[in-house]
């Protein structure tokens, strides 16, 4: 059965993650007030109470001084990019624009979640069975952690069960903002606690399973596995109030902790460094790319430190007459990868269709095109029947255990395409641990399979690309060869755990 309706929730009606539609304002000069982000410019005039904003400074000290001088309350600081999250009324927000050293004031826009034989279509299953990485082990993403920034995760889902009974989720965190003193912090949660319980609940659990679900056989005989079934998962829930500050706080946590995500003293074998983040959220209707946003500043710092960033391109469809792509995914920085949704027609074919809901870029402006396509339609992964997004799948299926009732479901969206790429990035870093995020991105794009559906391809920097599907369908085997470090296994060992092949 084909589910072509992507899981997309409206902010307010149901909790959804939506990145602010941000333009690219210029830095304030001289005595001119600092520019406002488009979202804040649109909403500030009607503000009657207080609002959270991101105050960007030429330095962190400038941003802190401006917030203090105007009497605003600090909620969080992003030390590495010189940004302070602060709460104030309309007059204070207007005043902070004119404080010395303030370069930009960004609104705390709401964010929205973007919602198989898929690993056959990507040749990912073939790669896990026939290739080995630089460590001599099957190419499963082993030795790499993937940070999933989303609604949270249920780490007890059977899809995450290791052979020893532990969970593939090695770190479980949540952004918490205190409604009384406005402070926002990223807090550690016990690994057996389900953080995916918001009104958007289920999205993060489903996404995490697509990244790194362990080989599992469902009671109906279906065999599933995630894109990188040997990777470890670090879940960062964006908190109970879904706004951009929560997602940025999660990215900032990764920036500060990617080398040892479980803390000092925990071995890399148990909890490997984070090498890629998955971000399956964005603004409804796309928006202009904003290089001054905190999101972009954070992902550029991550790239410089060897961490790739993967974005779902959005679920707004389009015809190429305008860009509906997710703004931060348009970042030209190497290692920032935007993903369109591909439909393999439930057969594993590599000559399927670009999903009709997958957001298109603007024809002729390659800066707005998605980078790559990956399966995002009819994807079966971990879920729970009581979680709202899981219930939209209408195809609950039982896991291997007697109590694993309805622990899997089938959902569609670019949210499901992006984690395929995040898992594949983990595989490629296992193949060549010394590769840079830019080299990994180039390997993925330059080796993509040119499926014919949709818009015609045109010449791009790394071959041919198109406004709807980017460079084509990801090819894991070819990308692994391009990034280097792999060898062909005589008999690659299947990932430990139960059987499963990401349907």
Ranges and model annotations:
Residues 62, 214, 235-335, 346, ...:
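Substrate-binding/access-modulating region of protease and related hydrolase catalytic domains
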């Amino acid at each position: 059965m084909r589910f072509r309706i992507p899981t997309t929730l409206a902010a307010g009606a149901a909790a959804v993650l939506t990145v602010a539609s941000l333009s690219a304002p210029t830095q304030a000069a001289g005595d001119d007030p600092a520019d406002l982000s488009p979202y804040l410019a649109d909403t500030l005039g009607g503000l009657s109470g207080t609002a959270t904003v991101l105050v960007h400074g030429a330095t962190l000290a400038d941003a802190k001084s401006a917030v203090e001088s105007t009497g605003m309350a600090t909620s969080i600081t992003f030390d590495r990019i010189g940004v302070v999250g602060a709460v104030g009324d309309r007059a204070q927000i207007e005043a902070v624009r004119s404080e010395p050293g303030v370069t930009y004031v960004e609104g705390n826009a709401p964010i929205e979640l973007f919602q198989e034989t898929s690993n056959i279509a990507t040749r990912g299953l073939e790669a896990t069975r026939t290739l080995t990485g630089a460590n001599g082990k099957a190419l499963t993403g082993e030795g790499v952690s993937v940070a999933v920034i989303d609604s949270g995760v249920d780490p007890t889902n059977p899809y995450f069960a290791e052979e020893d009974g532990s969970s593939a989720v090695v770190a479980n965190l949540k952004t918490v903002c205190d409604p009384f003193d406005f402070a926002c912090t990223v807090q550690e949660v016990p690994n057996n606690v389900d953080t995916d319980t918001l009104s958007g609940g289920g999205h993060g659990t489903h996404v995490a399973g697509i990244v790194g679900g362990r080989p599992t056989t469902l009671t109906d005989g279906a065999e599933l596995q995630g894109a990188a079934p040997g990777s470890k998962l670090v879940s960062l829930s964006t908190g109970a109030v879904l706004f951009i500050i929560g997602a940025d706080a999660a990215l900032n946590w990764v920036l500060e902790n990617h080398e040892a995500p479980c803390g000092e003293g925990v071995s890399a074998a148990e909890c490997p460094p984070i090498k890629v983040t998955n971000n399956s959220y964005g603004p409804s209707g796309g928006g202009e790319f904003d290089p001054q946003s905190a999101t972009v500043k954070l992902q550029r710092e991550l790239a410089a430190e060897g961490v790739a960033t993967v974005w779902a391109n959005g679920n707004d469809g389009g015809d190429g007459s305008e860009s509906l792509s997710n703004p931060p995914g348009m970042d030209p920085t190497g290692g920032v990868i935007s993903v369109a949704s591909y439909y393999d027609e439930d057969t594993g074919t590599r000559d399927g269709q670009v999903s009709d809901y997958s957001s298109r870029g603007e024809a002729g402006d390659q800066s707005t095109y998605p980078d790559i396509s990956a399966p995002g339609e009819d994807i079966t992964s971990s879920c729970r029947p009581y979680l709202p997004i899981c219930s939209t799948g209408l195809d609950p299926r039982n896991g291997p255990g007697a109590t694993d009732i309805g622990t899997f479901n089938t959902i569609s969206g670019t949210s499901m395409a992006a984690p395929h790429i995040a898992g594949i990035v983990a595989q490629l870093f296992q193949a060549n641990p010394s590769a840079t995020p830019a080299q990994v991105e180039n390997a993925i794009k330059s080796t993509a399979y040119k499926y014919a559906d949709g818009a015609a391809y045109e010449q791009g920097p790394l071959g041919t690309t198109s406004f709807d599907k980017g460079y084509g369908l990801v090819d894991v085997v070819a990308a692994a060869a391009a990034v280097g470090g792999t060898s062909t296994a005589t008999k690659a060992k299947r990932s430990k755990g139960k059987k499963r092949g990401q349907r």
